[in-house]
Curated annotation (Swiss-Prot):
PANTHER family assigned to the protein according to its UniProt record, in alphabetical order: ECOTIN, PTHR35890
The protein's name: Ecotin
Function: General inhibitor of family S1 serine proteases.
Residues of the signal peptide: 1-19
Principal location class: periplasm
The entry's keywords: Disulfide bond, Periplasm, Protease inhibitor, Serine protease inhibitor, Signal
The species this protein was found in: Pseudomonas aeruginosa (strain UCBPP-PA14)
Flavoprotein keyword on record: no
Localization per record: Periplasm
GO cellular component: periplasmic space
Family: Belongs to the protease inhibitor I11 (ecotin) family.
């Protein structure tokens, strides 16, 4: 009987923790039909102005030796009444590809990125980066950092 009560307590606590995690995303809207809401939580940095976040959205597709890209634009929106930003990738076009011959090479599954405007964001660990993307699009990210070394331009 004790084991049953303990198991019920653990189940209740774990479901409460899952609900609390979902509430952390509030007040961001739920994803529209056919879209997912993907969230990035960044670690705190001492000098966050020296960092950028590159959003790398894409699909895993069968590809040959050619360079392939998808097209799209990551649009910034503001959450009314809060001033928080969130991002939406509405349309993904392509794939576009170079046209080299690939004799004897098999196609393989590769991550093909979406290229376009709006994918480089400022770094802010205080707020999550919330991206709404089509269900078949995976959102990845990369952190960029500036060098401490600053060069001086030459007058000519």
């Amino acid at each position: 009987m004790k084991a049953l009560l303990i198991a019920a307590g653990v189940a209740a606590l774990s479901s409460t923790a899952m609900a609390a995690k979902l509430d952390e995303k509030v007040p961001y809207p739920k994803a529209d039909a056919g879209f997912t809401r993907q969230v990035i939580h960044l670690p705190k940095q001492d000098t966050e102005d020296a960092f950028k976040v590159e959003i790398i959205a894409g699909k895993t597709l069968e590809a040959d030796c050619n360079q392939q890209r998808l097209g799209g634009e990551l649009e910034e929106h503001t959450l009314e009444g809060w001033g928080y930003s969130y991002y939406r990738l509405d349309k993904v076009s392509g794939p576009m590809s170079t046209m080299m011959a690939c004799p004897g090479q098999k196609k393989e599954q590769r991550f093909i990125p979406v290229v376009g405007e709006g994918f480089l964001l400022r770094y802010n660990s205080k707020l999550p980066i919330v991206v709404y993307a089509p269900k078949d699009v995976e959102v990845r990210y990369r952190i960029w950092s500036a060098s401490e070394k600053v060069e001086k331009a030459v007058s000519e």
